[in-house]
Amino acid sequence: QRAFFKSQVPFVDTPQDLALFSAMYNFASKHKFKYVITGGNNSTEVVRESVDWTYFSTDTLHAKHIHKKFGELELKTFPMRDIFKYRIYDKFISGMKIIKLLDSVPFIKKDAIVELKSLYGWQPYQQKHYESRFTRFFESFWTPKKHGFDKRRAYFSSEILTGQMTRDEALERISKPELSEEEMQKEFEYIAKKLDFSIDEFTEIFKGKNKSFRDYRNNYFLITLGAKISNLIGLDNRKFR
């Protein structure tokens, strides 16, 4: 995580996403699972963010290059599962199938929240992914303030297209941050401490020159080529932008 902050790319959450994804699919592959159930769905995730906002966390060539330039520890036990192993080996050789249960039933986010609250006493968090304190800081402060984009635009666009939010409602939410300036400052100090940066070091990184995934080695060409071929033969319908 420190290496990704130092690299100046916007998607500093890549290490945690890569670790979680890789650990799960490594375990599934080791035990020869044929089905993996996920919460992914078209109802709230039909709009994909630009790759300049969120690059492929499973491009291990990219992650390893950033770590090589800025990392301070060896990655002996850090779980890594490359996108090609996931897309080719898991799906076509081992026969693993990804099941998105929420796409099999009518799924309306607001109705789901009401049901979870009434049945289980669940307390909703402010915004998508804000169950993670790091992600809350990253999406509410780091990317808007440093890199100039708000990931809520993609989230709300999905809900607009599926009739769960109006454009006016989305614009009203986008017009103001989810956290106050005081809360953001507290989170800035908290994350800096957790990552063992001094406030001055973290501030220097924040003010540094922004970079893109294109500034580091990557498999973008091969990934997008594979996606285009999959689209042509009907195996995939994702569109990258």
Where are these regions (language model features)?
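Nucleotide-activated chemistry modules centered on ATP-dependent adenylation/adenylyltransferase
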Residues: 1-241
